[in-house]
Amino acid sequence: MLTLLINILQDIKEVSLEKIATALPIPILFESRRKKIQRFLSLPIFNMSALWFPIIKNWHSQTFSANQTIHLVIDRTIWERKNLIIISIIYEQRAIPVYFEFLSKLGSSNFTEQTSVISKVLPLFKNEQLLLLGDR
C-alpha cells in the first residue's frame, strides 16, 4: 500500500487525501478508499522518529562536515487553524523542518513546550556544535 501511495503522489503531484483517494485504483467507493488511506496512514509505524528522523540523520551526515556548527531554529506558527511548534535546520538560507508538534492551545509556546520539543531533536545531533535560534 505504501508503494502504491508513493506512486500516486508522484503521479498527481499533490498531497490531498481526496485527490489520492480518487487516484487509488481500488474498485471500492470513493469514501471507502479515503477511509482506507486514513486508517493506513494512522498506523503507529508512521511517526516522526521511525520515518523522518532516519532521513534527517542520513541527510545531515552527508551534508554537514564534522566540525560545522548546525543552526537550529525553533518557531511557533499557525497552519490551517492548527498551532504548531517547529524545529528546523538552516541550510542554504532555507529552514528544513526536523520535528514539529501540535500545541493544544492557541497563542505562544512556553518554556516547557519548547524544551520538550528540543529534547526530542537533540539526540539526532550527538557530539555536534549547535546554535539554537528563536525569537523572544
Give the positions of each predicted feature.
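Conserved, well-structured functional cores that handle cations and Mg-NTP chemistry
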Residues: 1-136
